[in-house]
Amino acid sequence: MILSEDFVRKYDKRIINIHPSLIPSFCGDGFYGLHVHEAALKRGVKITGATTHFVNEITDGGEIIMQKAVEIKEGDTPEDLQKRVMEEAEWKILPLSVEKVSNDMISKR
């Protein structure tokens, strides 16, 4: 666990994380940075992507907000894949997720 249970409970559904895979694949303890992309390439999956989710007491275990798929190309290195996932997925869905969560919070007031 990265943040304490008390902290994530206090800010329930107000902390967003972005993870460089399509959760539930390649997530949880030990899956961060290039490790995620190395695991996807080693497994031989054809599609990966990024997921935004709310943070809870389980690493990468919170409610999913948004996902975007990215194709894995023949000859990809972990670094190639990391760059493509950031550019094609992470950088697109993070601002959209923040906007969605903000709008949902405002509409519930």
Language-model regions, residue ranges each:
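Donor/substrate-binding cores of folate-linked one-carbon enzymes
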Residues: 1-107
